[in-house]
Structure formats: C-alpha cells, structure tokens
C-alpha cells in the first residue's frame, strides 16, 4: 500500500507562526522594564546611558518584523503545507523565538567579533531557513501554483530571499573581521528590492 505524503492547509500553521513571532517580539523588549531611572532623575540620561540597549533592541525588533512580513509573503502564495515545509517552519520559529538571546548578548557586552558575529550569524540562520522554505515550496509539487512560481513577482521573491540571506552572510564575515560598526552594513538590505526586481525582469 502506498501512503500519500502528509499535507495540510496553511491556515493553522500561519496562525501558529504568527503567535510564536508575536510572543518572541514581545519578550525581546522585556529587558526595558528592568531599567531604573538614573540618579539625576532625567529621562534623557536614561536614554543616553542605555543607548546601546535601545539601539540593539530596536534593530532586532525591526528585523523580526521584516522576517514576519517575508513569512506572510511566502505563505500567502502557498496552497498546502507538506511535512518538510512544516519542519522547516518549526526550525525557523525556533530561531525566531531564540532571537532575544543574541540580542541580549550583543546589548550587554562589548562589540567583540564573537559577540557581533553570533548576533549577525543568528539572523543569517533565520534568513537561510526562510530561503530553504521558499526553495522547497517552489520545487515541491502542489505547494505553490506553477504560474505563481514563474511569475515576475514569484521570481522577484526568490531573488529577494537569496539576496537578503547573502547580505546577512556578508555582514557575518565583516563582523568576524571588524566587529565595531559591522551592523551598519545591514543597511545593504536597502538595495535588495531594486536588485531583485531587475533580476526578475531578465
């Protein structure tokens, strides 16, 4: 007897994924609740003394939000979810749920190559898992409609995912070599959309 591969609709996994991301993005900001007012009682001093913490938490919050947008873009074009895609999504959610750990490490310690490398490397892992999900969805029969895969928007999404992962990997290498200010190179992500659009038109 041939057993058909297990496949499910995407609604439940989308709802579950949204819940995990919402919890992770909330936990990320909890360290701010432990901040104490400085001796001079000024809010401006509170912000200046904790500028690195605010900056790191804000950056991580924005990046998780962008990953969530990418996740929604992917699953909006998916008809069904098979077991490999489900496990890839669970791995992605595990990495998202642990994002507060590298964020806390980078905001509480000096910017050494190990500290910044771990932080950027963790984001590269999340992006790579997203790219693997998209790669599997594009090639596995029935998960995405062929016309969606072959459309300009579909090709643009594929190139965007590859480029985003590539930028994270490049910044990861930079972080290992020159950790001070390495995260500024994440602004290279601003060039991803126009490049992906141009590649998709070829």
What do these predicted ranges mean?
Residues 1-202:
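Multi-pass alpha-helical transmembrane bundle typical of ion/small-solute transporters
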């Amino acid at each position: 007897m041939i057993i058909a591969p297990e496949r499910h609709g995407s609604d439940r996994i989308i709802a579950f994924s949204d819940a995990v991301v919402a919890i992770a993005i909330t936990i990320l900001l909890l360290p701010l609740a432990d901040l104490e007012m400085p001796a001079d009682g000024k809010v401006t001093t509170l912000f200046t003394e904790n500028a690195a913490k605010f900056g790191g938490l804000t950056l991580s919050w924005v990046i998780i939000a962008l990953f969530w947008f990418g996740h929604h873009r992917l699953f909006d074009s998916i008809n069904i979810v098979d077991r490999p895609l489900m496990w890839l999504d669970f791995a992605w959610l595990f990495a998202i749920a642990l994002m507060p750990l590298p964020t806390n490490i980078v905001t509480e310690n000096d910017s050494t190559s190990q500290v910044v490398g771990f932080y950027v490397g963790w984001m590269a892992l999340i992006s790579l898992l997203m790219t693997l999900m998209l790669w599997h969805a594009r090639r596995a029969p029935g998960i995405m409609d062929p016309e969606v895969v072959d459309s300009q928007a579909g090709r643009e999404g594929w190139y965007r995912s590859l480029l985003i992962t590539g930028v994270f990997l490049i910044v990861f290498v930079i972080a290992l070599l020159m950790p001070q200010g390495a995260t500024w190179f994440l602004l290279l992500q601003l060039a991803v959309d126009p490049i992906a659009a141009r590649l998709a038109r070829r």
